[in-house]
C-alpha cells in the first residue's frame, strides 16, 4: 500500500468521451443562458456540490449533465481554459 504513494496515478479520458463531454457542456451552457441563468455560476455550483438542481431541466440539460462525471466535466473545462490562454 505504501509503495503506491511513490507513483503518480494517470487519469485519461478517451477521445469519444471528450467529444461527448464537450458537446454536453455546450448544450447545457446554452440552455442555462436561455433560461436567464449565469452558466458559470451554475456550473461551479454543480461541480462543487454534485447537486443536479444547479442545472436547468430546460432542453433536457439536467439529464445530459448527469451523463458525464464531474471529474470529466472539470477536465474539459480546464483544457478549454488553458487552450484559450
Curated annotation (Swiss-Prot):
This is UPF0297 protein Clos_1665. InterPro entries: IreB. PANTHER family: UPF0297 PROTEIN YRZL (PTHR40067:SF1). It comes from the Bacteria. Transmembrane segments: none annotated. Disulfide bonds: none annotated. The lineage of its organism: Bacteria, Bacillati, Bacillota, Clostridia, Peptostreptococcales. Belongs to the UPF0297 family.
Amino acid at each position: 500500500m505504501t509503495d503506491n504513494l511513490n507513483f503518480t496515478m494517470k487519469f485519461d479520458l478517451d477521445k469519444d468521451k471528450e467529444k461527448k463531454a464537450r458537446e454536453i457542456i455546450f448544450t447545457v451552457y446554452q440552455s442555462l443562458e436561455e433560461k436567464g441563468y449565469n452558466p458559470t455560476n451554475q456550473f461551479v455550483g454543480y461541480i462543487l456540490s454534485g447537486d443536479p438542481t444547479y442545472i436547468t431541466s430546460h432542453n433536457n440539460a439536467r439529464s445530459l449533465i448527469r451523463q458525464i462525471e464531474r471529474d470529466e466535466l472539470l477536465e474539459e473545462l480546464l483544457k478549454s481554459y488553458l487552450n484559450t490562454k
